[in-house]
């Protein structure tokens, strides 16, 4: 398509800009399981393996002071957040309008499930899994969590452009709490949308679970096996993760975001985390996240994968920080939204961004291990037969894994003209 070709040209032109030299470039990059531009797995999507990265400098402007909070409206440009959602959808699908892009996304999802040409249907429920991990009650938390402006931008897009009725949408964080700044902003605009969290009350609904809904592919000890009914009863799911690091696994992106759908305690210290961490020497092993990614009620229902990168963070907790010095951010917040129809490809791009900006992130070595397993789930390097429902039907490849060539050009195989691997489509707001 002509539009797609124009986008590709723009991407290549932007990616060849020189990179500013800064101190952290001397830091040795984390070790990874996969070498650059050596894709494995089967790409997914309308345009296979495509990841759309939208960048709107100035969308997030918090200065780090205590006089304001990162989530305040004064520190976030809602108009730019809406642009990020619209641009991501357009570039992901190749469509010229947001409305047509949604239609293409719904049609692709249903066609993959044997319902050729079907778009969104009347009464079909959508559950959105956000990452509000750093919350302790309904009171506002200054730590990094889901952005109220970005979430509202997505909800507006779903209601006004995709035509999804408010009562068919659920925003869920079953393992934690939906704080006031998030709930109040979104509920005041769309009072018909349901909000589900760990405790309920104050307008939120308390999470309920379908016990034993996930049967892990290997013995996972006392790891929670219940799944929130917000997801088991949904027809579609949207995974809206954050762009940040995490101790143990190196990163927390879309793959780990599923953990919050399980019947765990709001106090993380009381929960099991079996087979979350990669082997420190890079030896392949069974990874729990692959079971989440391939489960019929989680990854199997996912319409769209998103990574909210308004405030990308080096660490899992605390206030957002530090600012990003790499190109194209140049000392600002990343002010980005990343989207894909391929659950493996999107997290690979997230890893490449995080480890390029923060090469000294804790536990970043081999942080791509769960994605290498997911990309080759039908013939996993660890030898695991992934079957998250335990019904004797093993998973096949869940998507394509690949690292970009370098942090300067940021090109994947399809950006280099090959018919394999990932294609990264970047657009910067003018």
Which stretches of residues belong to each language-model region?
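Sec/Tat signal peptide C-region and signal peptidase I cleavage site
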Residues: 19-23
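Extended, low-polarity segments enriched in aliphatic/aromatic residues
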Residues: 25-122, 133-141, 145-153, 159-430
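Positively charged n-region of N-terminal signal peptides that target proteins for export
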Residues: 1-8
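Bacterial N-terminal signal peptides
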Residues: 9-18
């Amino acid at each position: 398509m002509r539009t797609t070709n124009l986008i590709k040209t723009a991407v290549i032109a932007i990616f060849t800009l020189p990179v500013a030299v800064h101190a952290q470039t001397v830091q040795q990059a984390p070790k990874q399981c996969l070498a650059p531009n050596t894709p494995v797995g089967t790409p997914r999507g309308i345009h296979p393996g495509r990841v759309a990265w939208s960048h709107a400098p100035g969308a997030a402007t918090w200065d780090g002071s205590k006089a304001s909070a990162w989530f305040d409206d004064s520190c976030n440009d809602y108009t730019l957040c809406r642009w990020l959602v619209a641009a991501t959808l357009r570039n992901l699908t190749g469509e010229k309008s947001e409305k047509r892009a949604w239609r293409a996304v719904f049609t692709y999802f249903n066609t993959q499930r044997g319902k050729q040409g079907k778009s969104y249907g009347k009464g079909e429920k959508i559950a959105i899994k956000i990452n509000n991990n750093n919350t302790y009650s309904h009171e506002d938390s200054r730590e990094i969590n889901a952005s109220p402006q970005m979430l509202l931008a997505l909800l507006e897009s779903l209601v006004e452009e995709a035509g999804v009725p408010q009562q068919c949408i659920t925003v869920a964080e079953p393992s934690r709490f939906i704080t006031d700044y998030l709930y109040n902003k979104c509920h005041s605009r769309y009072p018909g949308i349901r909000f589900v969290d760990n405790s309920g009350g104050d307008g939120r609904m308390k999470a309920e679970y379908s016990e034993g809904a996930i049967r892990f592919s290997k013995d996972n000890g006392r790891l929670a096996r219940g799944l929130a009914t917000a997801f088991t009863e949904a027809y579609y799911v949207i995974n809206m993760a954050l762009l940040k690091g995490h101790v143990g696994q190196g990163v927390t992106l879309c793959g780990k975001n599923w953990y919050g759908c399980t019947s765990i305690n709001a106090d993380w210290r009381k929960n099991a985390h079996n087979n979350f961490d990669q082997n420190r020497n890079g030896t392949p092993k069974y990874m729990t996240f692959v079971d989440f990614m391939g489960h019929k009620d989680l990854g199997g229902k996912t319409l769209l994968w998103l990574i909210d990168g308004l405030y990308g963070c080096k660490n899992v907790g605390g206030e957002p920080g530090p600012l990003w010095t790499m190109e194209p951010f140049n000392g600002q917040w990343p002010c980005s939204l990343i989207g894909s129809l391929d659950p493996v490809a999107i997290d690979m791009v997230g890893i490449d961004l995080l480890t390029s900006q923060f090469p000294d992130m804790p536990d970043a070595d081999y942080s791509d291990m769960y994605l290498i397993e997911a990309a080759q789930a039908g013939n996993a390097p660890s030898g695991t037969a992934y079957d998250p429902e335990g019904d004797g039907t093993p998973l096949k490849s869940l998507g394509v894994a690949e690292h970009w060539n370098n942090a300067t050009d940021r090109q994947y195989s399809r950006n280099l003209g090959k018919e394999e691997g990932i294609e990264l489509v970047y657009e910067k707001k003018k």
